[in-house]
Structure formats: structure tokens, C-alpha cells
Amino acid sequence: MNIHMKRKTIKNINTFENRMLMLDGMPAVRVKTELLESEQGSPNVHNYPDMEAVPLLLNNVKGEPPEDSLSVDHFQTQTEPVDLSINKARTSPTAVSSSPVSMTASASSPSSTSTSSSSSSRLASSPTVITSVSSASSSSTVLTPGPLVASASGVGGQQFLHIIHPVPPSSPMNLQSNKLSHVHRIPVVVQSVPVVYTAVRSPGNVNNTIVVPLLEDGRGHGKAQMDPRGLSPRQSKSDSDDDDLPNVTLDSVNETGSTALSIARAVQEVHPSPVSRVRGNRMNNQKFPCSISPFSIESTRRQRRSESPDSRKRRIHRCDFEGCNKVYTKSSHLKAHRRTHTGEKPYKCTWEGCTWKFARSDELTRHYRKHTGVKPFKCADCDRSFSRSDHLALHRRRHMLV
């Protein structure tokens, strides 16, 4: 009878050990043995003296520690393979982190939630975007502002996450850095690529393409000013009307302008611009002056201001007659002065019966007021008026002396 009871006790112990091995990962607890219903009625089972050794045998069985205690180490990252599919329903949220270099996503398993949370807190300082995607629903929900995460697709057994960045409607010059400006900054090396513009005139003509290279940096290049008319009307006015500019003669202006135009044309012949090249092929190789050349009107003005003292002497117009050393700043004044030496009087009075002639036009105007009686110069202190400005100046001096 005692041998039979010992066998049953050993059998129960083996059964509990098998249960402990099946429950892998569960903590070891002290379990009180329960007898079968057929053995509960026998009084010899409770009186067996060796039954107290059963808890001692269970204490000798060492169970594996739980995984929660193993994941306490916050300095270890997850190295196990992770299933990236988002179609499966999970109870725990999946953390997806996308880096700008490799675009790989890592998710935490339900057993190591604390490890993934600690690793995500350490990686928060790096320039990455961490978005939480709830995989229990069919559509992915992005909790933080960032790129949209589409459904995963597998190629060759590998899972990939499609990260879609919202692209604002902008010009082609807005590069990839403009798209990701609200998410994170990525250092992008941009190379200048020439832009090709195609102009189609008519079905009979061949497409003319103009290649305009993009400037990498505006420091080393001059400002390109598009002016289809060539010279501005202000410059042409200064070239034609020399009396409005003091200390500038018509000869010096024409000489400076012709020099600038000749230099610009020489530069265009050596390095023709794409626009002039297309125009030359279209209009029988006739090259038009274009203001894209580095010699613009502003450069000629700067060159004119910073001239040498020798060029300033050219602006002083001297009378070349013997014994006359008069100097004028305008060429018209010098021409009028030279008429006094030559005796030429081209300006004649047109009043009937008057035969007066004058060397200057202003003298003729003053003389003509004698015939008409016009006195445009009026005194502000009294009611008198005069036909000449110098007479009014003498009259006002008298008022000041009184």
C-alpha cells in the first residue's frame, strides 16, 4: 500500500514539473497539491508522513524570470527581427520612427513595450520624425505633423513603408528642402542644371531652344538687365541734348558712348549670348546689341564719374584765338563767343523795317521785346517791370539801399 502511494506521489510531482515547463516565462509559485477525487476518500493519503517533502521538491524547480524584469536595462536597443506589416490587429500601439538617411521603420513587440519607449526617448534628440500609427484600424492615423505613412508592401519577403510627403504647389525652383521644411531639415547638395526653354513660332519653322544656365551664386556674376530697346531713353537724351548736362560736351559724350558700345559689341562677338545667337540664326546672322553684357548704362555712368583729371580738362572749352583766354563749360557758349571774333551774326530781326543782326539767339530775343513791349520781369516791391533780367536786378539793389 505504501509503495502504491509513493508511485502516485511521484507521478503527481512529474505532472507539475511538466506544467511548469509548458508555462515558459511564468513566475514560479508555490502550488498546493490537490489529490484526485478517487484518492480523497482514502484516509491513508492524509496520514502519509512524506507528503511535506512535496513543497521542497517544487522549490528546487527554478523558473525563468519574466521578460518584464529583463527589459529594465534602458541602454540596450532592440535587435530582434520585427514584423512591419500594419494589416494585423494589435493591442499595443506601434511606434514607427523614420530617419532621413535610410528611411527604415522599427516597431516594438508587445513583450518589450518598455524597451521601445526608452529607446524612442533616447532617439528624440536625433533629427527624426516619430509618428504613432494605430494598427487596429484599417486606415493609418498620423498623430504628429509629418509625412503620411501609406500601406506596407513586401518585395522578396522584405517589408517597406511608403512615406509620402505633402508637396505644396510651387515653382520648379523649389527643391526638396522646401518640401520638408516643416518636418525636418536635410542637407541637400544642389547642382546647377541648365533650363531649356523651347519657343515654337509656326508649324513651318524648326523649334528654337534657348539654354539658360542657372547661376549657382549671384556673387561672382554681374546683374543681367533685360532691355530690348538697348539704350534707355534717358541715356539717348543725354547723348543728344548736351546743353542740359553741365561740364559735358557733345563730343565727349559721343566718344564715351561709342567706346562703351564698341566694347560691348566686342564682348558679344567673343562670347555671344544665347538670345543673340538665336536671333542671329533667325535674322540672317544679324546680331543685335543686348544689355545682358556686363557693360550696362550704370557701369558707363560710374566710369564717367571716376575719370582721370586729364579727362576733366577736356570738358573745359577754351577759346583758341590769340590774346583771348576765355573758358566755357559748354560748347554752345564757346561757339557763340567765337562769333564775336569772326564777326558772324546769323540771327536777324524779323520785325518790319528792322535790320539788326546778332551773334547769339538770346540777344535777338531781348531785342525783339523792344518791338513788342513785353516786360516779363516784374519787381516784387513795386509795380515796375522790365524786359531784361539784369535790369530788374539793378532795380532791386536800389530797393535794398533805401
UniProtKB/Swiss-Prot annotation:
Per UniProt, the ranges with Low complexity bias are 91-125
Q: Where are the zinc fingers (C2H2-type)?
A: 317-341, 347-371, 377-399
| Residue spans of biased composition, Basic and acidic residues class | 217-226, 299-311
Bias (Polar residues) = 282-298
Q: Name the InterPro entries for this protein.
A: Znf_C2H2_sf, Znf_C2H2_type
Per the record, residues carrying N6-methylated lysine are K313
User: Which Pfam families does this entry report, sorted A to Z?
Assistant: zf-C2H2
Task: Alphabetically list the UniProt keywords.
Answer: DNA-binding, Metal-binding, Methylation, Nucleus, Phosphoprotein, Repeat, Repressor, Transcription, Transcription regulation, Zinc, Zinc-finger
Cytoplasm keyword on record = no
Q: Where in the cell is it found?
A: Nucleus
Keyword Zinc-finger attached: yes
User: What biological-process GO terms show up in the record?
Assistant: negative regulation of transcription by RNA polymerase II; positive regulation of transcription by RNA polymerase II; regulation of transcription by RNA polymerase II
Q: Which residues carry this modification: Phosphoserine?
A: S202
- Region Disordered: list its residue ranges: 79-125, 217-254, 268-314
On the tree of life, the source organism's domain of life is: Eukaryota
Q: Where is this motif: 9aaTAD?
A: 80-88
Q: One MF term from GO for this chain?
A: zinc ion binding
What does UniProt give as GO cellular component? chromatin; cytosol; nucleoplasm
Q: What is known of its domains?
A: The 9aaTAD motif is a transactivation domain present in a large number of yeast and animal transcription factors. In KLF12, the motif is inactive.
Supply the PANTHER family for this chain: KRUEPPEL-LIKE FACTOR 12, KRUEPPEL-LIKE TRANSCRIPTION FACTOR
Q: What does this protein do?
A: Confers strong transcriptional repression to the AP-2-alpha gene. Binds to a regulatory element (A32) in the AP-2-alpha gene promoter.
The family annotation for this protein states: Belongs to the Sp1 C2H2-type zinc-finger protein family.
Official protein name in the record: Krueppel-like factor 12
Task: Provide the taxonomic classification.
Answer: Eukaryota, Metazoa, Chordata, Craniata, Vertebrata
Question: Gene behind this chain?
Answer: KLF12
